């Protein structure tokens, strides 16, 4: 068996022969990471990515200075979508080791689920995986209902049914209730709503290959909110939370939805489809209607919703939208505590009115006159939140997935956002 490469930490600079900007050096005992006190977690993550790039697949984190955050930073950079990596963790106290183990179980589940090929992960499989994860952490407190296919149409989940009907794999709504109180009449503290588009071709507004090749990851919002609920439970969440996952393929067929179709929702709103590639908001609307009906204190929806958010923030930040300044501030505080990147983008009352249609109350995409695509998408969603000005957060999760490796991440899913939402739920 190959001996594990020892990885140690030092606050001293590397030997001058390695250069004055060296973040790691190699010696007879292994590899030393040289911390400078400026961005130590980022330095560790970037160094781990380089170590993986050297083909080193077995490491032992040894010596002083390792804690949960530094171990996790190393793993975030070291983990990749191919091959097996083995880490021998340093001695941590029981609480730190439990926290690390929970991250390894749940956030790795999120990353692996998002990375799964669309052929292996359809709408039903995504819903079932979510149920399995949550049952693994709190099965006695979990009940759920899966509604799919024509049952969605019969129960008037018209956004989800319309988008998903073009695929041979039926669309699915997962409604999951985490109720640790044991009281079936206990108030619902929070609702989480996730976009679970397991493959997005764009429909008849078809994507080019360069924009379609990563669309197995278009269910990243659903995976992330599922992981967030599971992780919050491991941190002691004792309030009732409901999870709604809106799962579908967006494909082309003789039965697929078309431009000019009008979707009539249960809350009385109707929306004209002028871009079948703006499908995420159409399925989320059904989940938000259900979430609002619970009258929770907090609604969070999460979706890989717009290219506009990526244009603004790249893959480096999740975009946050809210009319509730206090709640947005709480989310950003949670993000800072968890060392996760969120950035608030504008959402104003006028964005709700920038989706004009000649034939319906709403258009599912903005016109050239209203180019703030991420904000108008959030404005669209607000029409399906009963009290949209208070207690609602929309996260356009641009940092969910990377098509290519960068200095701190392998290609694929990042798992970012799980800890922040869990932090907010348990604050």
Swiss-Prot record:
InterPro entries: Leucine_aapep/pepB, M17_PepB-like_N, Pept_M17_PepB, Peptidase_M17_C. Keywords: Aminopeptidase, Cytoplasm, Hydrolase, Manganese, Metal-binding, Protease. Gene3D superfamilies: Zn peptidases. Mn(2+) 1 binds at residues 200, 277, 279. Probably plays an important role in intracellular peptide degradation. Homohexamer. PANTHER family: LEUCINE AMINOPEPTIDASE-RELATED, PEPTIDASE B. This is Peptidase B. It comes from Salmonella choleraesuis (strain SC-B67). The gene is pepB.
